[in-house]
């Protein structure tokens, strides 16, 4: 109840499209599941993924491949948890973001460096004066909103390296 996230349990129904593609099944499993905790220190993560074939275009890797979905999921969970706890979502993010490196996630991903806390502070500073702009917009019949989200992007694909040595 103090806002410390201790676990994340995710069940995903993943659309693989109409046929098996090169890396289609790896997107909702390896590429998605490994980054589910985002840039938050969550010690326990459970991911259950069921892939289904549909009558849509086959899914394959292109720009991000599973990571945008994982980041969206954890950020929505943070927003919902903050609402249910009656806590400011930005405060909840700051409380749970990891700051020590290297950081090993519950799903086996090692993040070697980052400055997530600094990025949040920079975003808050960049939004200075937002309330005044919101009030001004409201007088003109326009609505403004402000949201924060963290995004973790890994620099490589699969979490392993392969080499073959021949003599």
Predicted regions and their residues:
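Proline/glycine-anchored alpha-helix kink/cap motifs
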Residues: 1, 79-88, 123, 163-167
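Glycine-rich loop/linker segments at domain edges
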Residues: 1-77, 152-160
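Predominant activation on well-ordered alpha-helical scaffold segments within soluble catalytic domains
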Residues: 43, 71, 75-79, 90, ...
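Helix-loop-helix junctions that connect adjacent transmembrane helices in secondary transporters/permeases
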Residues: 97-167
């Amino acid at each position: 109840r103090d806002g410390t996230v201790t676990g994340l349990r995710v069940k995903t129904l993943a659309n693989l499209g109409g046929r098996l593609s090169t890396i289609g099944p790896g997107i909702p499993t390896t590429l998605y599941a490994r980054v589910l905790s985002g840039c938050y220190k969550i010690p326990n993560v459970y991911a259950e993924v069921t892939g289904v074939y549909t009558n849509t275009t086959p899914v394959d890797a292109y720009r991000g491949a599973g990571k945008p979905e994982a980041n969206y999921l954890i950020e929505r969970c943070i927003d919902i948890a903050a609402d249910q706890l009656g806590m400011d979502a930005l405060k909840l993010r700051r409380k749970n973001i990891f700051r020590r490196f290297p950081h090993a996630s519950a799903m086996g991903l090692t993040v070697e460096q980052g400055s997530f806390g600094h990025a949040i502070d920079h975003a808050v500073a960049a939004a200075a004066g937002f309330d005044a702009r919101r009030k001004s917009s409201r007088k003109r019949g326009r609505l403004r909103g402000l949201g924060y989200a963290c995004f973790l992007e890994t620099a490589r694909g699969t979490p392993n390296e392969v080499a073959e040595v021949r003599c």
